[in-house]
Amino acid sequence: MNEQITPVVTAEPDAAELPSDSRSQQVSPGRWVTRVVDVLLLLASLGTILNPEDPAVDDTGYVLTSAAWILFALCYIGIRVSRVRRARRGDQRWPERLAGRRTSYLITLATAVTLLSAGLDIATVEGSDEVQDVIRSFGVIMVLLAWAILHLSYAERYAQLYLNADEPSFSFPETPAPTLLEFVYFSFTVGTTFATSDVEVRSTRARGIVLCHGLLAFVYNTAIISMVVGLLTGN
């Protein structure tokens, strides 16, 4: 009589069930690049904010720190746009690539102060030579990039809040499994219209974050409009 041998299939452990050491070894190079860019952006923000020199006095130092900030800001935005596209195409690991809560908060705070600093530099720089024109141009670019970073960082905060809460903090119509695109959509909607549009906010904590986001976006947009009017009128 022939005995039937049943093969034993050993299931591979899920990433969430692996020990911390194993999970740390699974951190992709792309995630490390993201962390490095986030840290460099924070350092560049500190360099821009804490620069004691007047841009009209120390043109070289201001231009260098501003150029570094713009470079890292473009990298930050490019990484986030790439994440949104990959999540939209079905990448199931996009939650693992989100910035931590502390990092996201620090980037939001540093970006807000950087915007105010760049706006003041634009308003206080006098003269019409080439260096002053470069300073003004850098200031405008920094303000626009800071505006985009603000809403992208809030999108990640909303995603973290949704994923870590016991009950969903947001409800997207006909979207039972939202991706990063939905949170970016919601964040930019709040930032441009100061409204939640068709998204339902379902927790008190989420409403508090949305309120702070809306107020900060109002200040941002007001500063940008004032800056544009000042540049157009020459004041």
Show which residues each predicted segment covers.
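Alpha-helical transmembrane segments and their membrane-interface junctions
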Residues: 111-134, 190-204
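Juxtamembrane helix-capping/reentrant segments at transmembrane boundaries
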Residues: 91-110
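Alpha-helical transmembrane segments
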Residues: 52-75, 134-150
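Membrane-water interface of transmembrane alpha-helices
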Residues: 74-88, 152-164
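The first (N-terminal) embedded transmembrane alpha-helix
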Residues: 28-55
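Pore domain of cation channels
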Residues: 182-189, 201-235
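Membrane-proximal soluble regions of multi-pass membrane proteins
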Residues: 162-203
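Membrane-helix interface/capping segments
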Residues: 79-97, 120-128
